[in-house]
């Protein structure tokens, strides 16, 4: 049973009538452009074929009822006429409530909804299960009530909900790629203007995601520290964001900056340049150049931004040794664990999977999880 069939069957069973719509929104992997989004820079993610699926129907009153199929069919019920506040015990509910609360502030022309939610985006792996949920919920209301909101607005609404209601400080990339993703393409996103350019992926190339299964612990506190260091760097250059600082300007005065801040700034500036170049390398089908840029990105995250861990570096080394210059591999996501992403010819996937299976656990004591993904379509009816 796929997610659509599962949620539709559950909807009929629990609510006693059939769902009218089924909506999906995908997770994502970022191919290159790490910690650039909150510096108003560029990112190059693609949506993946793991998603949140919601079967739903409009109600003729002001009640929202939500079933979380992946959490033992837990129910959340709230009214659109009362102030929407956080749920005491069900964290998943807060993503739904936050999206609805912020939608009300954007466009209040909607009524109640019944929905059943299920997803297969791995949680805690840095593949944006939360953004996928936020965009799916926003799309449900937009589709059921024909709200005049485009994908970028649904994405922004999800980001606001996560920042202000859930209380997690995220950039805009995850929601934007979930809303706007395009099949067989990556998206070069300008995080300042929210402009997005579809970049075709070379034929016969697999997007491989390998979860290190190293439990991320530092991610919240260290993420916020990195943001502060970047803001300090932007202030030093008297610019609104590091996006506005050139590598030349930085190199001329790098020695005057706090040495740690200087390393953080150098990562962001060089990563922005790499990301823009990577988009044109992908478009040309130049997997070799893409691989070099991914390697430089990983080294920069390891040495300048200092967000990798030995387990992640080990995974990258194993993959790199197997593929040589046929493609690329790097850590992806916020850091301190999580996943690596590799772009490799499809015929090399078995060799990579075998090498990782033979070496990673032997070296780290942790068993990896291996995903082969396709660049997929963004949110909509399914």
UniProtKB/Swiss-Prot annotation:
Binding residues for Mg(2+): 130, 162
Site positions per UniProt: Transition state stabilizer: 28
Active site: 174 (proton acceptor)
Record Gene3D superfamilies: 3.30.230.10, GHMP kinase, C-terminal domain
Biological-process GO terms, alphabetical: galactose metabolic process
Keyword ATP-binding: yes
EC number: 2.7.1.6
Pfam families: GalKase_gal_bdg (PF10509), GHMP_kinases_C (PF08544), GHMP_kinases_N (PF00288)
Keyword Metal-binding appears in the UniProt entry: yes
Cited InterPro entries: Galactokinase, Galactokinase_bac, Galactokinase_CS, GalKase_N, GHMP_kinase_C_dom, GHMP_kinase_C_sf, GHMP_kinase_N_dom, GHMP_knse_ATP-bd_CS
Binding-site residues for substrate, renumbered to this chain: 34-37, 223
Reactions that this protein is recorded to catalyse: alpha-D-galactose + ATP = alpha-D-galactose 1-phosphate + ADP + H(+)
GO molecular-function terms, A-Z: ATP binding; galactokinase activity; magnesium ion binding
PANTHER family noted in UniProt: GALACTOKINASE-RELATED, MEVALONATE KINASE/GALACTOKINASE
Family designation: Belongs to the GHMP kinase family. GalK subfamily.
Name by which UniProt lists this protein: Galactokinase
Gene: galK
